[in-house]
Swiss-Prot record:
Its EC number is 4.1.1.48. Belongs to the TrpC family. It is an enzyme of class 4 (lyase). Disulfide bonds: none annotated. It comes from the Bacteria. Keywords: Amino-acid biosynthesis, Aromatic amino acid biosynthesis, Decarboxylase, Lyase, Tryptophan biosynthesis. This is Indole-3-glycerol phosphate synthase. Gene3D superfamilies: Aldolase class I. HAMAP family: IGPS_B. CDD domains: IGPS. It catalyses: 1-(2-carboxyphenylamino)-1-deoxy-D-ribulose 5-phosphate + H(+) = (1S,2R)-1-C-(indol-3-yl)glycerol 3-phosphate + CO2 + H2O.
Length: 259
């Protein structure tokens, strides 16, 4: 199973980070951050569907998507061409991301008014704190890899630190867990993380089950304006698009076509 392998492959890296920067010291550094996180929920509300544009170099299914990968340059293009938030993949082994990419984007100022979402396989409170330290305003939490108790723990900690959570589901049972945890931003992942197969009808099936007070984000497999129009008709608030953008020769032109 791909999801399980990704989590396992990253455990040694997490332990090394804990050794280099113990939790107590990490917590001190986070408390000293002078500026509050940008509210991603506010950025995703509106009449028109919003775009979360993803900084993504590679994936397990496609390999390297963009050889000439410059995360700061890509984030700047996103910020100038209508993105409402920027997702930054930080998983190293399968997506070739890094926490340093997140930090570089935040410190560069190219997207100073947009929330940054750390997209990774987060399962430990340590990762929540380090997300804030490296400049994240929000984090991804994947229900498929978390117990209900751990999901609630990570949600509570994130909110304590002022960060929003995109809580990702793929099935009805996962959606029920997310709603029971009082998640307010629900990500409907059209990709099965166990097989990496895409099915856009996932959003179609699950969207009607989500109460109106939640913000709904459709993720994965979104390639064209027609895809977005279809999802907009289903009542989603935002779409998360990565591969279709970073694989484009002209990212700005692709964004204009999508929006």
């Amino acid at each position: 199973m791909i999801l399980e392998r990704i989590v396992t492959d990253n455990l040694p890296d997490l332990e090394r980070r804990k050794m280099r920067l113990p939790l107590a010291k990490l917590q001190e550094l986070v408390l000293d951050i002078p500026y509050p996180p940008i509210d991603m929920a506010m950025k995703l509300k509106g009449r028109q569907v919003r775009l979360i544009a993803e900084v993504k170099k590679a994936s397990p299914s496609k390999g390297i998507i963009r050889p000439d990968f410059d995360p700061v340059d890509i984030a700047g293009i996103y910020a100038r061409n209508g993105a409402s938030a920027i997702s930054v993949l930080t998983e190293e082994h399968h997506f070739m991301g890094s926490l340093d990419n997140l930090k570089k984007i935040r410190e560069s100022g190219v997207a100073s008014k947009l929330p940054l979402l750390r997209k990774d396989f987060i399962h430990d409170p340590y990762q929540v704190y380090e997300s804030r330290l490296y400049g994240a305003d929000a984090i991804l939490l994947i229900v498929a890899m978390l117990s209900p108790e751990r999901l609630q723990e990570l949600l509570s900690l994130s909110h304590k630190l002022g960060m929003k959570c995109l809580v990702e589901v793929h099935t009805r049972s996962e959606l029920e867990i997310a709603l029971e945890s009082n998640a307010r931003i629900i990500g409907l992942n059209n990709r099965d993380l166990h097989t990496f197969k895409i099915d856009l009808t996932v959003t179609e099936r699950l969207r009607p089950l989500i109460p109106p007070e939640c913000i709904v984000v459709s993720e994965s497999g979104i390639q064209t304006r027609a895809d977005i129009s279809r999802l907009e008709e289903l009542g989603v608030d935002a779409v998360l698009v990565g591969e279709a953008l970073t694989a484009s020769v002209d990212i700005a032109a692709k964004m204009r076509k999508l929006l």
